[in-house]
Amino acid sequence: METIKRMIWPKKEIFVGDFATGVNRTVPVNIFQLVCRVVLRYMRTGKIECDSDSMTKFIVELLKTDCAAKWEWFMKRRQRGDYIVPLSIASIPIIPLLSYATRVRAVSVKAFGNELSFNVRVPRPSVPKKGLLLRLAAGLALAPICALAVYATLPREKLSVFKLRTEARAHMEDEREATDCLVVEPARELKGKDGEDLLTGSRLTKVIASTGRPRRRPYAAKIAQVARAKVGYLKNSPENRLIYQRVMIEIMDKDCVRYVDRDVILPLAIGCCFVYPDGVEESAALWGSQESLGVKXGGLVRLPGVVTQINRDIPSDVLLPQEVLEVRTGPPNAKDRNIFMVAGCPSQARFLVHNHCLKNLKRGLVERVFCVERNGKLARTPQPTKGAFGRLSPFRKAVCEKVGVAHRLGYDGFLSYYSGAKLRTYTRAVESLHITPVSERDSHLTTFVKAEKISTSKGDPAPRVIQPRNPRYNVELGRYLRHMESKLMKAVDGVFGETTCIKGYTADEVGAIFRAKWDRFDKPVAIGLDASRFDQHCSVEALQYEHSFYRAMYPGNKLLGKLLEWQLHNKGKGYVPDGTITYRKEGCRMSGDINTSLGNYLLMCAMVHGYMRHLGINEFSLANCGDDCVLIVERRNLKQIQRTLPEYFLNLGYTMKVEQPVFQLEEVEFCQAHPVQFQGGWKMVRNVRTAMSKDVHCVNNIRDLATRRAWSNAQHHGGLALSAGIPVVETFYSRFKLYDVPRKHQRIDTVTNVHKWRGSGGSYVVTPESRASFWAAFGLTGDEQLALEDRLERWEMDLFGEEGVDAHEPSILDSAVA
C-alpha cells in the first residue's frame, strides 16, 4: 500500500534557502481525488475535473451529465443494434424463474429421394411449482447488478464531446446548428524532438472541433456575431481587428476548434465583424463623437476641505488596561485646507481633502489605529493565535543567512541617503544627538491628518493619519536599517528564487517582471491579496517577528533592541487648531516609522511563503509591494487557495480578502496599474480612469505662480516618463504645459507627486498592438481611445487665469467609477 501511495502521491520537498522543510511529511490520501479518478476512468472524460467543492456534488453533477448524454443518444442518434447488449443483460434476472423441460420431437428430411428420420430434444420453459421462492430470491439478487450493467452498457457519445456540443449551443441560434457545425474527433498530441509538448496557440487541447469546409463560413459568421455582441460595432482599423481577433480566439478556445481550422476561420470571422446591417455605417453615434463639444479651457478650481460627519467612540471592551485615548476640545478656530483641480478634463470623478481638525483626527485614530469595523460595530483588531509566527521561522532563518552580520552606519553615511528638506531635518537631528543621546521620549509620536485625495464616490471614509516619531529617533534607527533595506530585499528574492519585492524598478522593468512571472506557468491565474488596513493589523507578535530579522543582523546590540522595543509600546499626541488628543497604543504599525515599508515587505513575504509551504504548493510566484500583493499559481490550485487563505491569515491576526482571479495578463492589477504591451515590451500603466481624475487635482497650495509652473512641469515630465507609447495616457500628460523651472523654489519637491515607480521615458509610438493590449487592460476599444485622445487634444489648460467653477462635459469615462 505504501508503494502505491508513493507512486500516486510522491513526497514534495520544499526548500527554504539551503534547508529543506516538509521532506518527511506524509501526504494524506485524498479520498475525493481517488474517487474522482475511479469514476472518471469509467466516464472516459480524459481528464480529472474537480469543479465542485464536495464529493457528493461532484458525483451528482457527473451522473446528470452522463444521463443527459445517454438520453440524447436515445432520442436523436439511436440505431438498430445499439441496445441489443443492454436488453440481453436485462433479461438475465428472468432466467432463474424458469424451469426447462425437454420433449422428443421426430424430424424427417428428404434428400435425393430418400427420407431420413431422427429425434431432436426441444427445451420447453415453464414456471416450476417447487422451489419458486428460492428462484425468485435469486432473480431479485441479480436484478440490481443487472440494472447497473444495463445502465453502463447504454450507448452514448464521449462526455467531453457532449459537453463541447452543450457549450457550443451558447454561440448558436439552435441546437441543430451546434450539432451540425461541430464534428468532434480526437486530437493528436504534438511532441517535440525531445519528447516535450508543443503548444500551438493559447493551449493544447485533448479534444478538438473539426469544422468541415462547408461549415466554416457559418461558424465564422456565428462567432463574429458573438464578438460584436461583446465589444460592439467598431471601425475597420488595425487595433480594432486585433480586439475582435482576441475575442474570437477565446470563443474558439472554448469550443476547442482545432488549429488547422482556425487559420481559415479567423480571417473570415474578422471580415464578418465589419459587415454591418443597413443603416449602421451611417450612424455616427456608434463611432463616438469626433466633433468638438465646446470644451472649455482648463482653468483652476479651488475646492474647500471637508470634515467627517461621523463621530464614534471606542467601546469599553476594546482598550487594554495600558491603552488610553484622551480628547481635549479647544476653541473652534480650525483652518480649512484646499484642493485645486484643473477643470475640463474628460473624467467625472472628483476628489476632496480632509481638514486638519479635531473631529477628523479623532475619527482617524479611532477607526484606523484602535478599532476595526466588524458587523457594523467597532471591535479590536484580530489577534494572532499562540505560536502562529513561530511557524514562519524557517523563512527568517533563510533570509538572515543570505544577509549575514551587518555593521551600523555612521552619521555621515546615513545623511548621504537624503537630500532637500529631509537632509536639513536629519542634519539638525544629528547635531542634537552629538549633545544629548537618544531617549525614550524621542520615540513619542506626533500625529496629524494626512492631506490625501479622497474620492467623492467613497462617501464619508475615515481620514488617514500620519504618525512620525522624532527625527532623532529616526536617525538612530536608520543607522541600523537604511543601508540594509536593499540587501534584505535581495535576500527575500533569493529565497523565493525570483524577483519578489517590487521596489526601485521602473514601470518598464515591472512590466517585464510580470511577463516573465506569467510565462512560468502552463495555465496561470493571478489572485490579488487585499490586506484590509495592513498597518493597523500589525500586532505586537507581528512586530516582534519583524524585529527578529534586524536583531539577527546585529546580534546582542542593546541600543537596537531598545529602539525596537519602543515601537511596541506607542505614546503619541495630536495637535490641531481646535484641540489635542493624547493616546497610548500597544502594537500597530505607525505610518511615520522609518522601517514601515521594509517591515511590511518582510511580513507579507513571510506570511505568503509560510502559507504556500503549509499547502505544499511549490509552483507559485509572488509580486509584493508592501501590503499590495499578487499571487500567480496554476489554475488547478485556485479553489484550494480561495477556500483556505482568509482563515490562515486570520490566525496570524490579519484580515485578508482574496480578490476575483484573473486569467489574462493585462487584467492583473498591481498598485492600481496593469501590464500593457507597447512598442518597447511591457509596461505597468496606471488605471486610466484613476490617472485622468487624480492627477488633475493637487492638495498642495498652488496659489502662487511659481508653484503652478513647477507642478505642471512635474506632471508633464513624470507622466510622459511613465506612459511613453501608451494610448490615451500619453496624450493626457502631454497636455500639461512646460514652463521654465524656477532656479530657486523651496516647495518644488512637495508638489511633484512622485509615483512609487520611476519612469524610464524613451521615444515610442502607439501601435495597434498597444491599443489592443490597452483594451484588454481597461476595456476601452480602439475607437473609444481615439475619441478620448481627440477630446484631450482640444483640452487647453489655463493655470494663470482667474479661479473658476467646476465645468464637466460628458465623456466615455463617465460610465466607470474612478
From Swiss-Prot:
Entry-linked PROSITE patterns: RDRP_SSRNA_POS
Annotated keywords? Nucleotide-binding, Nucleotidyltransferase, RNA suppression of termination, RNA-directed RNA polymerase, Transferase, Viral RNA replication
| RdRp catalytic domain residues | 524-641
Can you provide one Gene Ontology molecular function annotated for this UniProt record?
nucleotide binding
Q: What class of enzyme is it?
A: transferase
List the catalysed reactions.
Answer: RNA(n) + a ribonucleoside 5'-triphosphate = RNA(n+1) + diphosphate
Leader sequence range is none
Q: Which CDD domains match?
A: Tombusvirus-like_RdRp (cd23236)
Q: Give GO terms for biological process.
A: viral RNA genome replication
Protein EC: 2.7.7.48
InterPro entries reported in the protein's UniProt record: DNA/RNA_pol_sf, Rev_trsase/Diguanyl_cyclase, RNA-dir_pol_PSvirus, RNA_pol_HCV, Tombusvirus_p33
Family recorded in the similarity comment: Belongs to the tombusviridae RNA polymerase family.
Q: What does this protein do?
A: RNA-dependent RNA polymerase that plays an essential role in the virus replication.
Print the miscellaneous field. Readthrough of the terminator UAG occurs at position 297.
Q: What is this protein called?
A: RNA-directed RNA polymerase
Organism per entry? Tomato bushy stunt virus (strain Cherry)
The upper taxonomy is: Viruses, Riboviria, Orthornavirae, Kitrinoviricota, Tolucaviricetes
